[in-house]
């Protein structure tokens, strides 16, 4: 089995990259694909760049060139569900775009033509992630993760997203694009991210301060997932 892992930023993939043995590096457009072994397992690690387009370009290259059997999206997210705090884990049951709107033609908010309204995560992967997170003593929230090309940093933005998607747990900028590509290629995926901020007016300061913690927490979970897969 070959395990695919996707993170947007260098800080989000650095821990796993540094654990890779026999590491090779391939650049495709703005994406960097690292391939090697982690604890004896075949792993391909994508540093995609930030945003939906970068994530889609990188994930497409990853699936076509490296052909992983599954994809885990790791990194950080803004926590918008009640009770979430910095360092907590969010795991996707589904992902949706919060900034797509073709409702004028009868589609659901967030749905793009020729695509489902929500991209469903692989249940076995989500179950495994939750089991490991709870075993590690992490606080976990599982459910809907919403993506858009905006860093959410105000209560007004959170209120709008929650009005459209009341069950949203976390917000970020790549997961749904990654999920859409995996859906198109029929590759199972799950999103496993750690909370770096609350999406409010202090989000940018919190993100800068707590990104290393979020990267450490999510990487620890993904590392054990690799061992168990």
From Swiss-Prot:
It comes from the Bacteria. Pfam families: PNP_UDP_1. InterPro entries: MTA_SAH_Nsdase, Nucleoside_phosphorylase_d, Nucleoside_phosphorylase_sf. It is an enzyme of class 3 (hydrolase). Pathway: Amino-acid biosynthesis; L-methionine biosynthesis via salvage pathway; S-methyl-5-thio-alpha-D-ribose 1-phosphate from S-methyl-5'-thioadenosine (hydrolase route): step 1/2. One of its GO terms (cellular component) is cytosol. Its EC number is 3.2.2.9. Keywords: Amino-acid biosynthesis, Hydrolase, Methionine biosynthesis. SUPFAM superfamilies: Purine and uridine phosphorylases. It catalyses: S-adenosyl-L-homocysteine + H2O = S-(5-deoxy-D-ribos-5-yl)-L-homocysteine + adenine; S-methyl-5'-thioadenosine + H2O = 5-(methylsulfanyl)-D-ribose + adenine; 5'-deoxyadenosine + H2O = 5-deoxy-D-ribose + adenine. Substrate binds at residues 78, 152, 173-174. GO terms for biological process: L-methionine salvage from methylthioadenosine; L-methionine salvage from S-adenosylmethionine; nucleoside catabolic process. The active site is at residues 12, 197. One of its GO terms (molecular function) is methylthioadenosine nucleosidase activity. PANTHER family: 5'-METHYLTHIOADENOSINE/S-ADENOSYLHOMOCYSTEINE NUCLEOSIDASE (PTHR46832), 5'-METHYLTHIOADENOSINE_S-ADENOSYLHOMOCYSTEINE NUCLEOSIDASE (PTHR46832:SF1). Belongs to the PNP/UDP phosphorylase family. MtnN subfamily. Catalyzes the irreversible cleavage of the glycosidic bond in both 5'-methylthioadenosine (MTA) and S-adenosylhomocysteine (SAH/AdoHcy) to adenine and the corresponding thioribose, 5'-methylthioribose and S-ribosylhomocysteine, respectively. Also cleaves 5'-deoxyadenosine, a toxic by-product of radical S-adenosylmethionine (SAM) enzymes, into 5-deoxyribose and adenine. This is 5'-methylthioadenosine/S-adenosylhomocysteine nucleosidase.
